[in-house]
Swiss-Prot record:
Pfam family, one: Ribosomal_L29
UniProt GO molecular function: structural constituent of ribosome
Keyword Ribosomal protein: yes
InterPro entries: Ribosomal_protein_uL29, Ribosomal_uL29, Ribosomal_uL29_sf
Gene Ontology annotations of biological process type: translation
Keyword entries, A-Z: Ribonucleoprotein, Ribosomal protein
Protein name: Large ribosomal subunit protein uL29
Organism of this sequence: Leptospira interrogans serogroup Icterohaemorrhagiae serovar Lai (strain 56601)
Positions of the UniProt region annotated as Disordered: 65-94
UniProt feature coiled coil, ranges: none
Gene name of this polypeptide: rpmC
Cellular component, GO, one term: cytosolic large ribosomal subunit
UniProt similarity note: Belongs to the universal ribosomal protein uL29 family.
Disulfide bond entries: none
Length: 94
């Protein structure tokens, strides 16, 4: 499916598509790894791309619903970095 069509899906439909794609990926990897009976190995990479698209759409909707969430993630990352630098400089002194 194209990304435009995927964006038109409801949240529940995205979850269903995601679950279905993960099942297909699991079965394809099994067939390719164990039995070597997979007719088209490209199915694996295409399915992984579809899962990535679905997860991206899901995350975009999550950020639209909570616009402040992204800022808090960036802030906490900077805060951790500052804390780690302080800890490393304290080790170097002591």
């Amino acid at each position: 499916m194209k990304k435009i069509k995927l964006q038109e899906l409801k949240d529940s439909e995205i979850l269903e598509q995601l679950e279905e794609a993960r099942k297909v990926l699991r079965n394809s990897r099994f067939q390719y790894g164990v039995a070597r009976s997979l007719e088209n190995p490209k199915i694996i990479s295409n399915t992984k791309k579809k899962i990535a698209k679905l997860l991206t759409i899901q995350r975009e909707r999550q950020l639209k619903a909570n616009p402040g969430e992204r800022k808090s993630r960036v802030f906490s990352r900077a805060k951790r970095k500052k804390k780690n630098l302080a800890r490393l400089s304290a080790k170097a002194k002591g």
